[in-house]
């Protein structure tokens, strides 16, 4: 473990909470101190759930550590059953309680409760949230699901969606409609929306559709081996992937690969004349491996973007992530340190970032357009409207979401033509995002510079130049602390002629070049010398 300001994943017990919260008739008894109850807010505040998660905490305190914490846990289990009357109970420890080493599974079994008890042993100091969700769902399936006779009509299970998942609610609806249009029934959706009774009848389906490998692949592999159910490998995000998914499902179900794409508009929108400004946009992707790999395909093959960087935070999927990146001629960035991600983005200077909530913060700091494609996300990415990522409607949503942060084609030309205009200057941002308020009393930078009291500058002969004859840039250079690099006015003006999406990189390279050469003032000549140096 490490101390950090921000993390992509919580501890494993948060993943277990996502599974329990998504289900009905399930209750999770968590051996944890009072401080770990913060996790409730993830669901009530961020996901806007109307009720708190079905989780009971032992909430032990420091004074309890010298007494019997095992009895405290058993009391919590007994009270949870009597109060909530669940169909099944999950038991486990938080990262803090793991240090006490109480056997939560054995303690719960000793109570002989009249419902199944699912034991969770989640290594809090080696694994994280997605593993916790994946492992919890696997243990639930092992405890409750059994082989059984198949349904008369061809059917499947949808595996992987959980509470707090990125657009899982809407993806379930979209994929269900897609399958029903092919004549395939959905036997159960799990864990989200499923009860323990639904888990028990998973074996009735003919095959499984794995929507989210991060949280459902272990259960899908177990079902393939134990229940003799094959599962899909294609995640239907994007037009191409959805068509591949339809073909894969049709082969498993023995039906015709036909799907209703009458609502699909993304291909024409991407190819139409008012969308050509998308072509060649440089994009950086980061998030969970499943969404990043799928989004990279959409970005390159369906939007016409150039993928310049991609990576994921979940190390369990490092191998497929690296294999996918090779297909784009890239080396995948696999890290859970947001500072490394920010460093990579600064070095690549993309025109668009597709990432998580953290990349949205990074993009805001760097002034780069951004769209969210993956958990973890904040409250605004749990919309009231129908907004799937999967299927044909999901492809439409991807197009709208990704192009919205970008500057429109005609407006980009206006920015090039009227760089100094009060309305169309680079810092104003795309007009459809709303203007940036500037206080009426705040003077422009050049006016402020001219308003400063002028100071004299020494000549080479030891005399002085009258203050009014000193150019503002020279005055700034004279007043700058020793060793600080100053841009002259003509160089700043020339820098603004460089497209805004690579201007930051050009500025950094020029300042680095000047520092290496021992220069403290950057002129137009320095700017072009630096350009020639880095172009070699």
UniProtKB/Swiss-Prot annotation:
Domain of life of the organism encoding this protein: Bacteria
Coiled-coil stretches: none
One GO-annotated biological process of the protein: photosynthesis, dark reaction
Catalytic residue positions: 274
Chain sites annotated for binding substrate: 409-410
Function: Component of the dark-operative protochlorophyllide reductase (DPOR) that uses Mg-ATP and reduced ferredoxin to reduce ring D of protochlorophyllide (Pchlide) to form chlorophyllide a (Chlide). This reaction is light-independent. The NB-protein (BchN-BchB) is the catalytic component of the complex.
Family classification: Belongs to the ChlB/BchB/BchZ family.
Name the record gives this protein: Light-independent protochlorophyllide reductase subunit B
Gene name for this UniProt entry: bchB
């Amino acid at each position: 473990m490490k101390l950090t300001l921000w993390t992509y994943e919580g501890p494993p017990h948060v993943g277990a909470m996502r599974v329990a919260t998504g289900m009905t008739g399930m209750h999770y008894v968590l051996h944890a101190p009072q401080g770990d109850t913060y996790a409730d807010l993830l669901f009530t505040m961020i996901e806007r759930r109307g009720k708190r998660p079905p989780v009971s905490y032992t909430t032990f305190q420091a004074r309890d550590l010298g007494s019997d914490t095992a009895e405290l846990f058993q009391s919590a289990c007994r009270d949870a059953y009597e109060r909530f009357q669940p169909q099944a109970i999950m038991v486990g420890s938080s990262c803090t309680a793991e240090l006490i080493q109480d056997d939560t599974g054995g303690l719960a079994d000793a109570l002989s409760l009249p419902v199944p008890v699912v034991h969770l042993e989640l290594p809090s100091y080696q694994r994280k949230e997605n593993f916790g969700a994946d492992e919890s769902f696997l243990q639930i399936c092992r405890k409750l699901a059994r082989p059984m006779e198949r349904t008369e009509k061809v059917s499947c299970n949808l595996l992987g969606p959980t509470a707090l998942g990125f657009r899982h609610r809407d993806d379930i609806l979209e994929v269900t409609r897609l399958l029903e249009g092919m004549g395939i029934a959905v036997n159960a959706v799990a864990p989200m929306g499923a009860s323990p009774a639904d888990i028990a009848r998973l074996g009735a389906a003919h095959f499984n559709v794995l929507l989210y490998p991060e949280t459902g692949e272990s259960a899908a592999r177990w079902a393939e081996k134990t229940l003799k159910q094959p599962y899909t490998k294609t995640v239907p995000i994007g037009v191409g992937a959805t068509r591949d998914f339809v073909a894969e499902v049709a082969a498993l179900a023995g039906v015709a690969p036909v799907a209703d794409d009458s609502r699909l508009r993304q291909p024409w929108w991407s190819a139409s004349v008012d969308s050509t400004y998308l072509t060649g946009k440089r994009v950086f992707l980061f998030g969970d491996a499943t969404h990043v790999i799928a989004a990279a395909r959409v970005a390159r093959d369906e939007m016409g973007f150039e993928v310049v960087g991609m990576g994921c935070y979940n190390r369990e999927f490092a191998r497929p992530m690296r294999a996918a990146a090779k297909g784009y001629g890239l080396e995948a960035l696999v890290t859970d340190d947001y500072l490394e991600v920010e460093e990579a983005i600064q070095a690549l200077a993309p025109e668009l970032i597709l990432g998580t909530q953290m990349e949205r913060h990074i993009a805001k700091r760097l002034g780069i357009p951004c769209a969210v494609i993956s958990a973890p996300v904040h409250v605004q990415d749990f919309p009231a409207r129908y907004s799937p990522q999967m299927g044909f409607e999901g492809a439409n949503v991807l197009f709208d979401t990704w192009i919205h942060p970008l500057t429109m084609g005609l407006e980009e030309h206006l920015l090039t033509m009227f760089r100094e205009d009060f309305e169309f200057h680079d810092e104003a941002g795309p007009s459809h995002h709303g203007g940036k308020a500037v206080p009426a009393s705040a003077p422009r930078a050049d006016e402020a510079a001219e308003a400063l009291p002028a100071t004299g500058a020494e000549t080479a002969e030891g005399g002085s130049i009258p203050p009014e004859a000193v150019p503002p840039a020279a005055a700034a250079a004279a007043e700058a602390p020793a060793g600080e690099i100053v841009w002259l006015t003509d160089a700043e003006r020339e820098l603004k002629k460089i497209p805004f999406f690579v201007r930051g990189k050009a500025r950094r390279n020029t300042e680095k070049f000047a520092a290496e050469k021992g220069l403290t003032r950057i002129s137009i000549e320095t700017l072009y010398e630096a350009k020639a140096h880095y172009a070699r």
